[in-house]
Amino acid sequence: MGLSGDSPTRMERVKGMNKKTEELEEIIGYHFKNKHYLTQALTHSSYANEKKLGKLGCNERLEFLGDAVLELISSDFLYAKFTQVPEGELTKKRASLVCEPSLAYCAREFGLPQFLLLGKGEDMTGGRNRDSIVSDATEALLGAIYLDGGFASAKEFVLNFILNDIEHKQLFYDSKTILQEMVQAKYKETLVYELLKEEGPDHNKSFEVCVKIGDEEIGRGLGRTKKAAEQVAAYHGICKIQ
């Protein structure tokens, strides 16, 4: 017991986890009064099952709460920022800014995936890079901040890490729609997306796509799904022709 070479004790694992959560707190600029909220926000159901924590031991309830908080904050933000935009357009903007790929992108920007607690099998099959898992954890983290620090703290997190640089993010996540409208207005040629490469096992694929106006290639993109790769290609296409 406690000899060199032994597996880490429970206390050592707890200390290691505390150090990781403290690092995340520094990154997001919010320090939890109740650390349990943060730990639970990072706990995926696969880890909870593996550690026999029960159905309530994972982040799904916090995700449910965070989703509602995010909808309110993003709606309030867009209502105040775009005073001349009708309801339908505001709904579209909100949907593009808080959709699964967008939340996953935002989370990766501040390094959330490295802090997630996943079951060994889920981790080995690429779960840490899966948009659905990362975006769900982002909502769970928001829910945890809301419970621990209230609406003001939750709003500050959203404004700093999700709704920051809104023009660039909207351009990126609406790229296919924006490019289609640009091509229809300026060109007589048809916009075409072409799959160039598909690599990797089913659980961790990579796609490369190019977009063309007629026969002329205007952009390429890489992504973990074909749709994501098309968005990246469209973004580069916009940058080239605008």
Label every PLM stretch briefly:
Residues 1-242:
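Double-stranded RNA-binding/processing signature
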